[in-house]
């Protein structure tokens, strides 16, 4: 082995150990659950996820696909994969928490996440300042290797109105994803149109940084305000029911072509953009607490008339539902997709 190859191998081993220690400090309970199913130890688990071909100078970032407070997502190489990189070393444990959630979900799905309408996860790579200039010299952070999608549901509704057939496809996909999360005992905690990715005509849930396994200690509340269920406004924790509520708001945005409560807020403030003032936030919290998002978002009779069946279907997302509700909704949305295929 050449001196350069030996040096790279040593760096890789050091990064594997570093990431394993981060996982043990941040998520010991969830890590133990994942390791029990994988029948391995922390370092062997990280090594099993390692994507050497996209780590430590073996890959290049081509363009930014999206950026948030925790991470930026870059297109990789030929565009088949995307890399989610923490914005700083301090944010790295948050992404490793997401790695564990993805691992848990992949175990539940037998590795076939796409079939359950969750963005496929392909492992972990190491990123240094040489690849990502926002990092400090000598820092190495974990990055998630994900399947690259075409766009977000937010971009879809901003670009053009969707057909009824396509709306029912998105509804079916989101209900299928919600059902899978419930079966896997995972609460997403931050479902919104920006976190629903689209490839072709299909939708997939992404961004599990706020997610939690049901019987684990609750994560800090980071749900986007516009997508909060009324119970979260009063200090409650995210649940499967609040995930369903947020998914309903995503589907409502496809009908109105506005993010939740945005159109009414613009009319109220005579502004074309949200003000983010304290007064605006208080107004938004009051509107959410009413528990009637259809009333506060569908502001024209024409929309009510054109989307009557879909709005009737959506009302169920905003009230307490029976345990078997998702199965029934999935069957109904599948039937509607079939109807619109002809």
Curated annotation (Swiss-Prot):
Originating organism: Eremothecium gossypii (strain ATCC 10895 / CBS 109.51 / FGSC 9923 / NRRL Y-1056)
Binding site residues for ATP: 65-73, 84
Matching PANTHER family: MITOGEN-ACTIVATED KINASE KINASE KINASE, PROTEIN KINASE DOMAIN-CONTAINING PROTEIN
Domain of life: Eukaryota
Function, in words: Probable serine/threonine protein kinase which may function redundantly with MPK1-independent branch of the PCK1 pathway.
The name this protein goes by in its record: Serine/threonine-protein kinase ISR1
Gene Ontology MF terms: ATP binding; protein serine kinase activity; protein serine/threonine kinase activity
Enzyme class: transferase
